[in-house]
């Protein structure tokens, strides 16, 4: 139990008028540590108890069980709690040393599934930095949900269907070179895609031709299907090479095409429930009662189905297949209206489990303030970017530690980790401007900064030849140690907050805070001095490294032992 929860529970025992959660949220940290570690303001009880806050504070301070604390005192309208730092630090260090990387493991999920729709690049288009956000946010959430006791199911809902394949077939038939595509599939397909879109802006017949080829593809035309399959196979080979570099895996690659034969059931269900309404020749579902002005367009007047029809089929399939406790869609914020419609249509169909679906939206990645666009050829491709990040990391490692063993593997961990961490430390609803130099810096709020703090601790532990004993009691009560202990003790709550809010930036900011607190401690404390506190300080180092490494793992970032 963390200290805030402990205090809230003790106050709740003597204040039945307030819920423990309400008490927890009212607790404050005094500006001056001389006034205690945490304080409860009695103002909120004045109306209920019909007494002055000062009197309430004084009376309650007398009733609270002090055995858990150093002391409890009333100061004006506040009850100030002074924590028994030696006792708490001993408990926290024992928990981390005993549990190791399992420290803060929770059982909220009880093994239930969480479906995570993530990454989902478009076939025959390059994997750009724009796709990175969905990939790394989804991968981090998968680790977080597992830490909360759920079983994550990572689904790469590939963009392997749609009019763009009509465009690509037209482009390939006009200008394609089979040998060139086989040699450099994504590069060549991107050139074709950009070229055909540029031509379509001045020639309206291109769109008509593309629509015709896509119709052929839908009808199972042999030539169209073979080209589509080839584009898909070549793209997947390239994507999987990139996923290997990022250390990201998936449980399913069922993309849009997988649901081609599952949409008729959706239409039948909607018709059976009398939810389809004709509007200008199209079939729609009205959603005004959900506060959604625009109806969901299920089927166009030409009989073509739409994304929402496919996503309805996917939602039904995933519920039946995984019986998920949560279904999470890590997709850009521009799709917010689509996911509101999706949930509302499922609700109209009588599926209350739609309440368990969440659109985990995120902001845009820009470059020099400009929006990225595959269609216009304005993209930052991931593969060369990762290579450059690794090279930059290698240069810094060479300068700092030229004799480091396994430099290549460490440079990979630092370079890839830097890109992931920079993305994840940003509140997901905010966008960010892509700046590789800032990402790979060993200074500031970066992945390499946190990784370096972890490596520094491992170096200290190696130098001291220290391994903590689960049967030894370690405790510290000094101010610098206490700052670290408080953060380590807060780790379970940070994991829960990250999970509840689908917000990996909470975890990334925690990792930065812990690394900063340790570096401050390192600067002011002679850790290896041979005195009575040495083992206690080394136990704190061990616990800090354990939690830092686990925090980075939850962000899908490696923590090298040497850098």
From Swiss-Prot:
GO biological process: arginyl-tRNA aminoacylation
CDD domains hit by this protein: Anticodon_Ia_Arg, ArgRS_core
This protein's UniProt keywords: Aminoacyl-tRNA synthetase, ATP-binding, Cytoplasm, Ligase, Nucleotide-binding, Protein biosynthesis
Main localization, broad class: cytoplasm
Pfam families, A to Z: Arg_tRNA_synt_N (PF03485), DALR_1 (PF05746), tRNA-synt_1d (PF00750)
SUPFAM superfamilies in alphabetical order: Anticodon-binding domain of a subclass of class I aminoacyl-tRNA synthetases, Arginyl-tRNA synthetase (ArgRS), N-terminal 'additional' domain, Nucleotidylyl transferase
An example molecular function term from Gene Ontology annotations: arginine-tRNA ligase activity
Enzyme class: ligase
Enzyme Commission identifier(s): 6.1.1.19
GO cellular component: cytoplasm
Keyword Protein biosynthesis: yes
Family stated for the protein in its record: Belongs to the class-I aminoacyl-tRNA synthetase family.
NCBIfam families in UniProt: argS
Record text on subunit structure and interactions: Monomer.
The protein's name in its UniProt record: Arginine--tRNA ligase
Organism: Streptococcus pyogenes serotype M12 (strain MGAS2096)
Gene name per UniProt: argS
């Amino acid at each position: 139990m963390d200290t805030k929860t402990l205090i809230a529970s003790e106050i709740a025992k003597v204040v039945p008028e307030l819920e423990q959660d309400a008490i927890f949220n009212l607790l404050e940290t005094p500006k001056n540590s001389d006034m205690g570690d945490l304080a409860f303001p009695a103002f909120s009880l004045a109306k209920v108890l019909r007494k002055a806050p000062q009197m309430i504070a004084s009376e309650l301070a007398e009733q609270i069980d002090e055995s858990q604390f150093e002391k409890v005192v009333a100061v004006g309208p506040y009850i100030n709690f002074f924590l028994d730092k030696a006792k708490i630090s001993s408990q926290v260090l024992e928990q981390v040393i005993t549990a190791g990387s399992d420290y803060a493991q929770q059982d909220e999920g009880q093994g239930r599934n969480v479906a995570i729709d993530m990454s989902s690049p478009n076939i025959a288009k390059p994997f750009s930095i724009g796709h990175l956000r969905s990939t790394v946010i989804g991968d981090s959430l998968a680790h977080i949900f597992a830490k909360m006791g759920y079983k994550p199911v990572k689904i790469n809902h590939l963009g392997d269907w749609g009019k763009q394949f009509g465009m690509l077939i037209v482009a390939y038939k006009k200008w394609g070179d089979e040998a060139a595509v086989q040699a450099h599939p994504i590069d060549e397909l991107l050139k074709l895609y950009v070229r055909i879109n540029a031509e379509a802006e001045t020639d309206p017949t291109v769109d008509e031709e593309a629509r015709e080829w896509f119709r052929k593809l839908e009808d199972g035309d042999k030539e169209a299907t073979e080209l589509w399959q080839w584009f898909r196979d070549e793209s997947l080979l390239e994507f999987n090479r990139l996923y290997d570099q990022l250390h990201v895996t998936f449980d399913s690659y069922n993309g849009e095409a997988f649901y081609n034969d599952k949409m008729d059931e959706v239409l039948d269900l909607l018709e059976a429930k009398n939810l389809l309404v004709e509007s200008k020749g199209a079939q729609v579902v009205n959603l005004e009662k959900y506060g959604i002005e625009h109806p969901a367009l299920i089927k166009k007047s030409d009989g073509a189905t739409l994304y929402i029809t496919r996503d309805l089929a996917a939602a039904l399939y995933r519920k039946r297949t995984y019986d998920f406790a949560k279904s999470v869609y890590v997709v850009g914020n521009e799709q917010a209206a689509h996911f509101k419609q999706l949930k509302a249509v499922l609700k109209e169909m009588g599926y209350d489990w739609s309440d368990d679906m969440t659109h985990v939206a995120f902001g845009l990645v820009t470059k020099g303030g400009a929006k990225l666009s595959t269609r216009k050829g304005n993209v930052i491709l991931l593969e060369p970017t990762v290579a450059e990040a690794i090279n930059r990391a290698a240069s810094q490692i060479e300068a700092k530690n030229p004799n480091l063993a396994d430099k290549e593997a460490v440079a990979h961990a630092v370079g890839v980790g830097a890109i992931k961490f920079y993305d994840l430390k940003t509140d997901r609803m905010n966008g960010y401007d892509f700046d590789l130099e800032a990402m790979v810096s060993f200074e500031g709020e970066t992945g390499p900064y946190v990784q370096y703090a972890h490596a520094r601790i491992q170096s200290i532990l190696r130098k001291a030849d220290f391994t903590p004993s689960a049967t030894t009691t370690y405790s510290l009560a000094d101010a610098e140690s206490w700052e670290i202990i408080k953060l380590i003790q807060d780790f379970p709550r940070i994991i829960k907050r990250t999970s509840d809010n689908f917000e990996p930036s909470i975890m990334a900011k925690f990792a930065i805070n812990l690394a900063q607190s340790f570096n401050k401690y390192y600067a002011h404390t002679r850790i290896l001095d041979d005195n009575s506190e040495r083992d206690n300080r080394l136990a704190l180092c061990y616990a800090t490294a354990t939690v830092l490494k686990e925090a980075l793992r939850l962000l899908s970032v490696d923590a090298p032992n040497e850098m």
